C-alpha cells in the first residue's frame, strides 16, 4: 500500500531540497530517518518532517508496519516564487526571488 505526504510552499529552493531528497530515495524508512538526522542542511529538516508524516499516515490510515516501509518515491517540484525588491544605487532596484518548493514523499511496504 502506497501512502503519500506533502509539504507545499516549503521555503527553500527546489534545487537545494533535491540534494537531500536524492540521499534517501529507495532506502528503508529507518535508514532514511538516520541519514536525515545527521545531514547538516536546512532542507533535511523539511524532508524529515514530511517523511515522518508519511510514516504516520501509513500507520494510521493503512495499518502498515513501520519496519517494512521503504521510501518508494520522493520528488521535489518548484512552488511559486515571492518577488521582492532590493534597492540599489542611483534609484535603481533589483528583483529578488524567494523560491519555494513542493516536497512529496511516498512510502510503501513493497
UniProtKB/Swiss-Prot annotation:
Molecular functions (GO terms): rRNA binding; structural constituent of ribosome
Matches recorded under Gene3D superfamilies: Ribosomal protein L22/L17
One short Pfam name that applies is Ribosomal_L22
For this UniProt record, the keywords arranged alphabetically read as follows: Ribonucleoprotein, Ribosomal protein, RNA-binding, rRNA-binding
Superkingdom of the source species: Bacteria
Please give the GO cellular component terms listed in this UniProt entry: cytosolic large ribosomal subunit
> Has keyword Magnesium?
no
In terms of HAMAP family, this protein maps to: Ribosomal_uL22_B
**Subunit structure, as described in the record:** Part of the 50S ribosomal subunit.
Please give the family membership noted in the entry: Belongs to the universal ribosomal protein uL22 family.
Its biological purpose is as follows: This protein binds specifically to 23S rRNA; its binding is stimulated by other ribosomal proteins, e.g. L4, L17, and L20. It is important during the early stages of 50S assembly. It makes multiple contacts with different domains of the 23S rRNA in the assembled 50S subunit and ribosome. The globular domain of the protein is located near the polypeptide exit tunnel on the outside of the subunit, while an extended beta-hairpin is found that lines the wall of the exit tunnel in the center of the 70S ribosome.
Supply the name of the protein.
Large ribosomal subunit protein uL22
Question: Which classification does the entry list for the species?
Answer: Bacteria, Pseudomonadati, Pseudomonadota, Gammaproteobacteria, Enterobacterales
Amino acid at each position: 500500500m502506497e501512502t503519500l505526504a506533502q509539504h507545499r510552499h516549503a521555503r527553500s529552493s527546489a534545487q537545494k531540497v533535491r540534494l537531500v531528497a536524492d540521499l534517501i530515495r529507495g532506502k528503508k524508512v529507518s535508514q532514511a530517518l538516520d541519514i536525515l538526522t545527521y545531514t547538516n542542511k536546512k532542507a533535511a529538516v523539511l524532508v524529515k518532517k514530511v517523511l515522518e508524516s508519511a510514516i504516520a499516515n501509513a500507520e494510521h490510515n493503512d495499518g502498515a508496519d513501520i519496519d517494512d516501509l521503504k521510501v518508494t518515491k520522493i520528488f521535489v517540484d518548484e512552488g511559486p516564487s515571492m518577488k521582492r525588491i532590493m534597492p540599489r544605487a542611483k534609484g535603481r532596484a533589483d528583483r529578488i526571488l524567494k523560491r519555494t518548493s513542493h516536497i512529496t514523499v511516498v512510502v510503501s511496504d513493497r
